[in-house]
Every structure is written in C-alpha cells, then in structure tokens.
Amino acid sequence: MPNSTAQYPEKDSWEFLVKSGIAGGTAGCVAKSVVAPLDRVKILYQTNHASYRGYAYSRHGLYKAIKHIYHVYGLHGLYQGHTATLYRVFPYAGIKFVAYEQVRRVLIRDPEHETHARRFLSGSLAGTCSVFFTYPLELIRVRLAYITNTGKNPTLTQVTKDIFHERDFLCNKKYPGLSRLSKICNFYRGFSVTLTGIFPYAGMSFLAYDLATDFFHKQKIDEWVSTKKSDKKLKTWPELLCGAFAGVCGQTVSYPFEVCRRKMQIGGIRKNKSFLRLKQVVQTTYKEAGMRGFFVGLTIGYIKVIPMVSTSFFVYNHSKALLGID
C-alpha cells in the first residue's frame, strides 16, 4: 500500500464520505455478529426478564442462560433479532465513523487543537448523530431479542406493527391532530436516556482508543508494535488491545444509562403498552435490586464489548486501507 498521503482522497470529498461509510458499516456488522449471542442474553438480563431473572446474579449464569436458549430455541434463538441488528448497525456504524471523521476534521484542524476535550467531543457528537437516525431500528431489535414465549419466532414486520399500534405518550383525546405523529414517537421510547448515555459512551470510546494508540506510538514502544510497512500502522495485537481498552472505558461510564434505556424500550410490552418515564425506571430498578440493579449484566457487557469494539476498530481501519482511504 502506498505510504504517500497525497494519493488518498481528501476527507471532505464525496469519495471519502462514501468509502468511510462503507468501511464503518462493514466494521459494525462484523463486530455485532461476533457477539450476538452475548448481546441477546445481556438484553434479557437488563430488562429483568422473568424467565432469566435467576441467572442474572448467579456465578455461572451466563453459561446457563446461553445453554437454556440453545436447548429451547436452538442456534436461531441465540441470534433472534440479529437481522434487525444488522439493519440498524450498518447505517449506525457507517454514520458514526463518517461523522467522527468529519467532526474531528473540523474540531482538530492541526496538532495544537488535538486536546482530550476535542477528541471526546468528536466521538460524542458522532455517536449522537448516528443514534438519532437509527434509533427506531434499535428499538425493534431490542423487542425481537426480548420476546421469548410466543410459541413462534417474532417477525420484524409484526414487531414493527405492534410498536406502531401501542398506546402513545400523547393523549389522543387531547391532541387528536397529533395522533399519527405520536405513533411515530412510539419508535423513540427511551430515546432521551439513550442520548444521555451515548454522549459519554461514544466520546470515551474514541478518546480511549486515541490515547491507547498514542501510547503504543511512543518512541520506545513503537519499534516493536508497528508494522514494517508503515510507522503509522500498529500490528494486529496492539490494535485489538486499543479497541478493547476503548470498549471497556466506554461501557463503564455509560452502563447505568443503558440499563434504564432497555427497560424503557420494552415498556410497551410490560406496562399496559404505556410509556415508561426515566424516573419510574430508576425508582423501580433501585427498589427491586438496589444499586447493583443498574449494573446487572455488566460482566457480560465487558465480555461482549472487548471483542466487539476491538473487531470494530480493527475492521474499520483495514477496510479503509482496502478502499484506499486514510
């Protein structure tokens, strides 16, 4: 691969936007596919599903939960809702990486502006942008993963219809003209808390990845972690380690928000198809399990996030190289 940056397209060109979007979308899909079974179990834990409540705090609960799902529903059960995940992840990851590259280009125009705050803000704004455009698909994915006892596998079409016809957060009697709009808002259950959580998660993930990369590029370390082809490119293992560090940092700071978000997303199933407010979710969670209720499934989160984020950054960087962008 040529080392001259002059041969790469400019970051504000359409070619770079399209190719970075493809690279980001591909990275997201590969990463999510790697950890799909863990994601299914984590959602069941976070939403306090009655059939899996006993596994959540047990020593070997993760293994037992996966074994139970496989025994009852087969391999497909571990990937239930994964199609909806891929529909969401490709545009989500694509938009996130494109937005990050563009926001970073604006906020960090030269090395003097490359501060921790600007790096964090670049990641946070990128995550916010991607969530806004893809949240309805995320809600559908969570519903598909949560449903377990219908006797047949729920379909994407059926779940979408169910969400649309659920009781909306506006009273139709008071606001009859907003009925259709409020139905669309059904697909944004938990959106406010999602934004609250994605801001620190995305910001910390990108910041931690940059800091880890900077660490490996220090002179005494760079000699044995960089490839021979390019001083800028890390070997596989340090590159994966940077992604793992980024994932752990992002997951830690945002996990309580994620637990609340999941419970708000499935509120239409559990609470007479009504909207759950953040205050209700926080009070109920604390009453049922105390502070540890906000961190239920965090172990799975760590187990999941290390391979997922590592794979995501790794595939993104190598996809960019294959597509001829930097």
Curated annotation (Swiss-Prot):
A UniProt-annotated Pfam family: Mito_carr
Entry superkingdom: Eukaryota
Subcellular location per the Swiss-Prot or TrEMBL entry:
Mitochondrion inner membrane
> What does the record give under GO molecular function?
coenzyme A transmembrane transporter activity
Q: Which GO terms describe its cellular component?
A: mitochondrial inner membrane
- The reply to whether Ribosomal protein figures as a keyword in the UniProt entry is no
State any GO BP term from the record: mitochondrial coenzyme A transmembrane transport
Q: Which UniProt keywords apply?
A: Membrane, Mitochondrion, Mitochondrion inner membrane, Repeat, Transmembrane, Transmembrane helix, Transport
User: Where do the Solcar repeat units fall?
Assistant: 15-106, 114-215, 234-322
For whether the record's keyword set contains Coiled coil, the answer is: no
Transmembrane parts of this sequence: 16-36, 83-103, 120-140, 191-211, 240-260, 294-314
Q: Could you tell me the membrane topology recorded for this protein?
A: Multi-pass membrane protein
**Major subcellular site:** mitochondrion
Q: Which family does it belong to?
A: Belongs to the mitochondrial carrier (TC 2.A.29) family.
**Protein name per UniProt:** Uncharacterized mitochondrial carrier C17H9.08
Q: What is the lineage of its organism?
A: Eukaryota, Fungi, Dikarya, Ascomycota, Taphrinomycotina
